[in-house]
Amino acid sequence: QDAIFKAKDLGNNWNVIWGADQHTSIYQLDTPTYINTQGTGKSASSTYTITLPKNQEKKLSFVIAGSKDSEEDALKSYKDILANHSEMLEDKKMYYTQLLERGRINIPDKKLQEVYNWCKINTEWLAADMESAGRFLGAGAIEYPWLFGCDNSYSLQGLVATGDQKLAKETLRVIKEMSEKANRNGRILHEMAFNAFVSHKGNTQETAHFVIAVWNVYK
């Protein structure tokens, strides 16, 4: 039978759904785990039985989908990914091929060139799109993927150098607009979480750094 696992945060309408494109043979809740969870925490496991003829192979795809709004939205995303993941993967490959062509370099040191290409890819992984704020560059994976005023003053210079002026300008715009909402006095925020909560309204350096960052992006 199918086993679609659903989980919801007790205090918020945050939902996650996960499963696979094959029937599960065994599933169990509250299984032992090596991961230390905060609060009450929940765990689940599923077992899949696969029979392979000699010299054959089989692909098993797992899907994780979530929503900050409802279980229905999470389930819709889950079904969409399950049905179209092959096409989505090809689209993603094409996207990253185009990304590597942006700000492309060709140097004798191919190892350094590979590092440069991975820097562009890693930077793209930090791009976030918040409905309530806009698109911006996060600070760093995995601990601090949200918005920082100080960090971006430095990061955006590298972003422009690798050819992504659009994301650099979008990030500056989000910092400016969210700082205005939080401070209303020209002070630039230090940190904003993904729920648009400004947890730190800014130190002395963020405002000066922001002015310099604007100059470096638009000069």
Predicted regions and their residues:
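Aromatic-rich carbohydrate-recognition surfaces in CAZymes
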Residues: I50-L52, K58, P145-K219
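Acidic/polar, glycine-enriched structural segments that form the non-catalytic walls/loops
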Residues: Q1-P145
